[in-house]
């Protein structure tokens, strides 16, 4: 907040606290004022029973509740500040993908921006979500581009807030033509197309993941969705109060779910920092991870005068990346800060090992990573491959920052010579 804004706020505060503001002191209400207040109350209360109003009231309460979660779980002022901004960004994303969703006129909503990457999402990826229902049939037309990995997770009805997978396609099973074009049908009957998902028993959304090795060289996939309506060209019906209420409830569910990931997705990792465990999508659910995804999850703890040396074996897979997250599972400043790396931007050491150095700010090591200013947080090592792949768990060594050059001298010297 700028100093001029502070000055304005202070001046306003002083203005209303001086003796000259005695005229602003509460005055006895006249009968006319009382009648006006009663009319205003009556005018607002007559709409209170609307489903959209009730849903919005619940969302307001959840915002307050989530702010208390941040205050209760944060360990530092920085985590509180980042946490409040995280809530703002999470709410914005929930509004984008759920609040603005319309199954009658569907569109793919981008889940992140150049400054927003929350929910443990991969910084080297793009995510899109579209809200659907099974009262309509749909078709998706697109092009797979040249990204390392593309997947469509089609989610059915929700049980206790969690989604079930009713269809999954990746860049191979979409069977694109020579130009990369593909089509995917979502219908309540078989349209006679091999790339088809039966939505007879319900469909709620599709989550699209694009994993990128090198943003400068790879072309993102493109795709659009349309309703297969026999009355093509007819005007989309006006949205109803019930539909808006459902959209607000969906926004609230997404907001509260993402705001509490640090409590629901392996929070015990923070109790035993600087180590990794293995996991896959079965451990999280389709609404969090893709069927092709495998993970090594960990947490970090490092002081300003320290560094973490992360050692692992290079993975022989089509895609992998390592991401540093805050306590709130946010990739802080991901477009301007080195908080993530892929297989395309690392150097393998002469001994065949892959090493990363995580610290507060840049270090001389070629595979350096930045904490984003946080002493503690999560680490996500994800890759795309067969489920029977058994990768060696990375090992984390906590050292003094001043010791880095003596420990990794050869690697650092080689990097500086390039």
Task: Specify the residue positions occupied by each region the protein language model found.
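A compositional/structural signature for long, glycine/proline-rich flexible linkers
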Residues: 31-33, 37-418
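Hydrophobic helical h-region of N-terminal Sec-dependent signal peptides
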Residues: 10-14
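Bacterial N-terminal signal peptides that target proteins for export
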Residues: 1-9
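C-terminal region of N-terminal signal peptides and the immediate post-cleavage residues
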Residues: 24-27
């Amino acid at each position: 907040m700028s100093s001029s804004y502070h000055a304005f706020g202070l001046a306003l505060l002083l203005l209303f606290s001086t003796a000259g503001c005695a005229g602003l002191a509460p005055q006895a209400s006249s009968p006319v004022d009382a009648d006006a207040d009663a009319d205003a109350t009556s005018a607002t209360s007559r709409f209170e029973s609307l489903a959209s109003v009730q849903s919005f009231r619940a969302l307001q309460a959840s915002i307050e509740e989530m702010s208390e979660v941040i205050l209760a779980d944060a360990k530092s002022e920085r985590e509180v500040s980042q946490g409040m901004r995280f809530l703002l960004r999470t709410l914005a994303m929930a509004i984008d993908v759920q609040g603005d969703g319309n199954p009658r006129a569907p569109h793919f909503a981008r889940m992140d921006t150049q400054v927003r990457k929350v929910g443990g999402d991969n910084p080297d990826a793009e995510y899109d979500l579209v809200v659907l229902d099974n009262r309509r049939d749909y078709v998706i037309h697109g092009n797979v581009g040249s990204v390392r990995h593309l997947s469509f997770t089609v989610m059915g009805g929700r049980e206790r807030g969690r989604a079930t997978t009713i269809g999954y396609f990746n860049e191979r099973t979409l069977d694109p033509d020579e130009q990369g074009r593909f089509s995917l049908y979502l219908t309540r009957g078989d349209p006679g197309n091999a790339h088809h998902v039966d939505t007879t028993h319900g469909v709620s959304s599709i989550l699209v993941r694009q994993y990128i090795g090198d943003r400068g060289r790879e072309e993102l996939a493109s795709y659009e969705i349309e309703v297969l309506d026999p009355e093509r060209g007819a005007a989309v019906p006006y949205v109803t109060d019930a539909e808006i209420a459902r959209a607000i409830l969906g926004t609230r569910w997404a907001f509260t779910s993402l705001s509490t990931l640090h409590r629901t997705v392996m929070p015990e990792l923070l109790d035993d920092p600087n180590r990794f465990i293995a996991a896959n999508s079965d451990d999280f659910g389709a609404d969090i991870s893709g069927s092709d995804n495998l993970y090594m999850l960990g947490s970090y703890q490092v002081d300003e005068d320290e560094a973490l040396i992360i050692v692992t074996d290079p993975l022989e897979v089509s895609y992998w990346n390592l991401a540093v997250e805050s306590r709130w599972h946010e990739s802080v400043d991901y477009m301007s800060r080195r908080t993530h790396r892929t297989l395309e931007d690392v150097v393998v050491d002469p001994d065949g090992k892959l090493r990363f150095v995580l610290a507060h700010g840049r270090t001389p090591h070629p595979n350096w990573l930045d904490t984003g200013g946080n002493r503690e947080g999560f680490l996500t090592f994800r890759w795309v491959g067969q489920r029977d792949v058994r990768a060696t768990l990375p090992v984390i060594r906590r050292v003094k920052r001043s010791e880095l050059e003596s420990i990794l001298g050869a690697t650092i010297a080689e990097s500086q010579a390039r």
